[in-house]
Every structure is written in structure tokens, then in C-alpha cells.
Amino acid sequence: MSITAERKKELMGEFATAKGDTGSPEVQVAILSERIKNLTDHFKDHKKDNHSRRGLLALVSQRRSLLDYLKRKDDVRYQTLIEKLGLRR
């Protein structure tokens, strides 16, 4: 259900803008996208889990806010991130 520490480190390594980067919007969006993907898979088996669905909506909203921020600050980084993650927009 949740992502492991190893998977988080992989994502940080892949999307980091500098060595040791853990808080850039790219890293945060990548980790949120992984959590969203895991929850989406969870809902295939547990269709009536509305408490988790509310959490999913919060994660999607948080990711959207970070993407809007990144687009406002640096459109090139935004476009690169969207392509890497395969998000629609």
C-alpha cells in the first residue's frame, strides 16, 4: 500500500535536481504520483473504501498544487516532469 524507503530513494535519485535533493517539486510530485498509483491499485480490490478514497483526493490535490507551482516558476522543468511521469496535462 505505502511505498518503501528504497522506492523513495530511487525516486529521489531519479528526479533530484542536485545531490541530496529531497524537497524539490519534482521529487515531491514523483513520490505523490507513486502513492496515487498504489492507492488506485488498492481501489480495484476495495471499491467501497471511501475513507482511503478521500485520502486519494487529497494526494491528487496536493500533486496538482505542486505542478501548478512548478509550471508558474519554470515551464521547462514542468514539461520535462510531465513527460517523465507520463501525466496528462
Curated annotation (Swiss-Prot):
It comes from the Bacteria. One of its GO terms (biological process) is translation. Keywords: Ribonucleoprotein, Ribosomal protein, RNA-binding, rRNA-binding. One of its GO terms (cellular component) is cytosolic small ribosomal subunit. PROSITE patterns: RIBOSOMAL_S15. Pfam families: Ribosomal_S15. SMART domains: Ribosomal_S15. One of its GO terms (molecular function) is structural constituent of ribosome. PANTHER family: RIBOSOMAL PROTEIN S15, BACTERIAL AND ORGANELLAR, SMALL RIBOSOMAL SUBUNIT PROTEIN US15M. Part of the 30S ribosomal subunit. Forms a bridge to the 50S subunit in the 70S ribosome, contacting the 23S rRNA. One of the primary rRNA binding proteins, it binds directly to 16S rRNA where it helps nucleate assembly of the platform of the 30S subunit by binding and bridging several RNA helices of the 16S rRNA. Belongs to the universal ribosomal protein uS15 family. This is Small ribosomal subunit protein uS15. It comes from Mesorhizobium japonicum (strain LMG 29417 / CECT 9101 / MAFF 303099) (Mesorhizobium loti (strain MAFF 303099)).
